[in-house]
Design a protein with these regions (language model features):
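An alpha-helical appendage that flanks or caps ligand/catalytic pockets
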Residues: 2-14, 26, 121, 127-171, ...
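N-terminal beta1-alpha1-beta2 module of alpha/beta enzyme domains
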Residues: 1-71, 168-175
Length: 340
């Protein structure tokens, strides 16, 4: 069983500890910070880093191209939202970047769980319709990557005549596809197209159930791998790790008070994204699941992304990660500035 550790880089220093109004995947660009952040991951032995996506942030293709030139071994997971460039163009862009990065990229497909996010870029399709579009989009992208002859395509969202790309991915049979999404519509599309299905950090029993659901929806015989996003909060002793965790939470709450944001998502708050909603439900059930899966940061921030943590000594957190791996996962992901 292989295990891959994935970090995350942004384009400027940002943290919920200091300013809860800034996005970890958006904002301005600090070139020196980007280079340093990437090198820290490479020198620290991370296998890959996620370059995130938001409707107000820098373009991930350019970020990956820049960081690939500043590193040698580190691989990249480029978040990409279908629907805003043609799938034929996306396929060529990714294949080109695969060559210029010497085969170090993968693409993370995020269809989008927030109508407001989508509408900033002019997308007014509803949630399930967006996933039907993603299905067509990935059909076309994969075919462009692998087809040796021009092809036509007639779908609900895309109609193509003699589509073809002279540039094919360096990686064969194509650039690895990661996929995120917790809804039923997401599972059907992701199980069909992805090489790696990504989850946020939920209790082990829930992860086992979700793995079973994705595998059941996948084509017969497909070899799927799985990723879990968690924030490691480490200490020399377990007591020091929990002290650090509560300090981090207090800093987040203080920064939210200063920004005029309520401390907790509250019972009436319900995000559109199904994954975020699930994390809030687990946080409402209890603060700690499976001995050290800690949920209060998810509750305090509205579960905007990877917001659950594993708390303990390095050895204890490693033991907890091994339990996720033994949930028949092939891939484990650790992300989050708060865990460093």
């Amino acid at each position: 069983m292989s295990v891959e550790f994935i970090g995350m880089i942004g384009t400027r220093e940002a943290s919920e500890l200091h300013d809860p109004t800034v996005s970890l995947t958006g904002g301005s660009i600090d070139l020196a910070y980007v280079r340093k952040f990437a090198k820290v991951h490479e020198d620290g032995g991370f296998d890959r880093v996620l370059v995130g996506y938001s409707s107000t942030g820098p373009d991930g293709f350019n970020v990956v191209s820049y960081v690939a030139a500043a590193t040698e071994r580190l691989k990249f997971l480029l978040a990409h939202r279908p629907g805003f460039v043609a799938p034929t163009l996306a396929a060529r862009k990714l294949a080109t970047l695969d060559h210029f990065s010497n085969g170090r990229i993968a693409v993370h497909i995020i269809t989008g769980g927030s109508d407001a996010e989508q509408q900033r870029d002019g997308d007014w399709l509803d949630h399930d319709t967006r996933y039907r579009r993603t299905d067509e989009y990935l059909d076309i992208v994969r075919r462009v990557w692998t087809s040796e002859e021009p092809f036509d395509y007639e779908g609900e969202f895309y109609q193509l005549k003699q589509a073809f790309s002279e540039v094919k991915p360096l990686q064969q049979p194509h650039v690895p596809i990661y996929f995120g999404g917790a809804s039923g519509a997401a599972v059907d599309v992701g199980a069909k197209h992805s090489n790696v299905y990504a989850f946020w950090g939920e209790p082990i029993a829930a992860i086992k159930q979700r793995i079973a659901e994705v595998k059941a929806a996948a084509p017969p015989g497909k070899d799927l791998r799985f990723s879990v996003s968690l924030r490691p909060i480490l200490g020399e002793t377990e007591a020091k790790a929990w002290e650090k965790a509560h300090y981090i939470l207090s800093r987040i709450n203080e920064s939210r008070v200063k920004a005029g944001i309520q401390l907790s998502a509250g019972a009436s708050f319900r995000p559109q994204a199904v994954g975020s909603s699930r994390l809030l439900d687990f946080a409402k059930e209890r603060e700690i699941h499976d001995k050290r899966l800690w949920t209060p940061i998810a509750a305090a921030t509205g579960a905007r992304g990877n917001t659950t943590a594993l708390v303990g000594t390095p050895e204890q957190v490693a033991e907890s990660l091994s339990l996720f791996c033994h949930s028949r996962q092939r891939k484990s992901r650790n992300q989050g500035e708060l865990g460093k």
